[in-house]
């Protein structure tokens, strides 16, 4: 099931000729429409001029499960059907299981996406669900280490009880810490062997551009980046006292992060443009 481009999006493409493409991947057995409507990206794409496509990637009684290869084929179909789309600026993000899948896609399909991210999941240690177990992704990251770079935006709530945030007791089996480590490995960065909460009480890692951001509703977010040669290849966001769900204010943060990167469709090389 593919929720096709709206009329406004098609008209926008005709005007602009080349626009970015963002895939949204819903959570485990969620309704794709719910994911799209609560993500914050539908409102954002109308302002920022990009195309959002929500996939029924997981399958249902009516549709076969896509898997990562199927998701890749959908991207090629869209690029062929809508030549206005920019093949150098294809991104994916998701919620929960969709976030785990987007995280895995950044490693498995590193030639396809310019950046990836997600809310409320990372890489699930000890789990073999959603095509993104730690063991296989770690092997691929090690093989690609230093040769492939993939920007990664990791966001979650500090009060998530479904996929808990990192703390001093769970870090060895924590989905977010596992994802940060594996992306550090693939990106050829210094690898954090274990968190040190004396350096940062939230993330346990010393981050650049570390700040606390407040929304107009009084909710705060902690954020910072890990860089390689001045390029922010990993951005982390923790929404204080928030649970297992999308957080609309962070959508703009993710999109601004994505827009710093494109990928050459021919050479597959990552291109860093800096902040706009």
What spans do the regions from the language model cover?
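Catalytic active-site module of serine/aspartate enzymes centered on a nucleophile-bearing elbow/loop
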Residues: 249-276
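The feature captures the conserved acid-bearing segment of alpha/beta-hydrolase catalytic domains
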Residues: 115, 121-220, 224-229
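Extracellular/periplasmic catalytic domains that process cell-envelope and extracellular macromolecules
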Residues: 15-18, 43-48, 84-86, 98, ...
